[in-house]
Amino acid sequence: MATPERRTAPGTPAVHTGAPVASGPVPVMAPLGWLLILAAGTTLILGSWLLYGTTAEGMWAGYHDGIIGTVVVLAGMGLNTSLPKQPLLGICGLAGILLILFAVFFDYPTHVVVIEMVSGVGLLLGVGLYASGRRD
């Protein structure tokens, strides 16, 4: 009969992997804020194309909301690059404040006021979430 052999030498030390690395929470706030910024800008652009009328109020609201929406979408896409984040967040925040002021003080039809108010509040919430979720 054959005698069983030991596979490892008795002097071989056991391999220790060390203490497990503590992982932090999954970053949710910044991506959610970024998504909200882009959604608000896209809503503003699509609303100005599809919902605003061809009257004087609808045309002027379409002009400034289309420009603001385009700037917001470009700034939102810039947040995922190596560009500095603070100026882009400032642009988005100012656009949100401006949209809320447009909705409150201009005498536009109800659907224009709703689109501007929803986009403005969405922008401010997105900027707040993005800024609170960033650690750099």
Model regions and ranges:
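Hydrophobic alpha-helical membrane segments
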Residues: L88-A103
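Membrane-water interface at the C-terminal end of transmembrane alpha helices
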Residues: A30, L123-D136
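Short juxtamembrane and helix-loop transition motifs at transmembrane-helix boundaries
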Residues: P20-A30, G47-G58, L74-P84
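Membrane-helix boundary connector in multi-pass membrane proteins
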Residues: L83, L99-M117, R135
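Structural signature of hydrophobic alpha-helical transmembrane segments
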Residues: E57-G69, L89-G90, I115-G120
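Membrane-embedded alpha-helical segments in integral membrane proteins
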Residues: A39-T54, I100-F102
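Intrinsic N-terminal pre-sequences and regulatory tails
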Residues: M1-G33
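Membrane-helix interface "capping/anchor" motifs
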Residues: G78-G90, S132-D136
